[in-house]
Amino acid sequence: MVRKNALIYFVLIVVLVVASGFSMGMGAVKIPFTDVMIVLAQKIGLFGNHIVPDQFRGVLDIVRIPRVLLGIIVGAALGISGTAIQGIFRNPLAEPGLIGISAGASLMAVIIIVLELSIFASLSNLLGYYLLAFGAFAGAGIAALLVYQISRSDGRSNVATMLLAGIAINALAGALTGLLTYVADDQQLRNITFWMLGSLAGATCETVMAVTPFIIIPVLLLPRMGKALNAFALGEVQASQLGLKVNVIKRNVVVLATMGVGASVAVSGIIGFIGLLVPHIIRLIMGVDNRHVLPASAIFGALMLTLADMVCRTIVAPIELPIGVITALLGTPVFLYILIKDKRKLVL
């Protein structure tokens, strides 16, 4: 089993590296895979004598490399956060959006887009593009905090109440988002629509560096909770009898998932299906041990988003499709197949 898991990790990493290289070469400007590898190798001090056209080098440095790196870290955050949320709620259909994280981020982003000039003018001048990112991140955090506080009773948080609170927050955020969309002008409506459908088009080196710390923390810490999430599969009472601090674990998982998803939504908009689909595929490959499923979900999430981004840039090039549309179109048939194939196992 150890060798099998090690082999799976190795294959996933190799495929991710190769897919990233091909993705950097795809788009309106086609760049040979060998030139991509040479540029990447030169950045670490190798192949110093090889010459790559300046046009290719500029496209890679300014656009493609930051975009692919952002896709990798966002995909990793969405994949591992989805796995952790499913584990803590013991619900194979759960995802971060279920507890209001995505809805809170969306609402705050729409508020900023619609009211930026009238209310957030000074902040917009100070933060520029990052105002939307900070706002979305704050919205995700506020929504998660509300859900967690509503679900607490006598110092404990109830999973069923948390799910119901998440549904309520989603409904409220959806209603307010719809209201703001209704009063938005044409340009604001276009911005809202593009952001709600998700995109990595705005990736820069600064964006990658700004969001990486918020994503690295959950990606590194959530796998350490794999053993505890395995115990949660038996039920909260049984996990408590095994000596686990159930409320502390639930709080930590929700906080870390919120950090990862909130940061991802802040820089890429709403990208669906990664957090829902990735855990199912990894469990089919590696089994249900969260000690292995969590890190593998991060790698596979990065791979899925990298491939989806490559498709959205090339399928109707030079026009670029929203990445959320691609993940939904690719993910829905696979997810339905999994549901039909294993529907007896997925009965809650």
Where are these regions (language model features)?
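Alpha-helical transmembrane segments in inner-membrane proteins
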Residues: 1-348
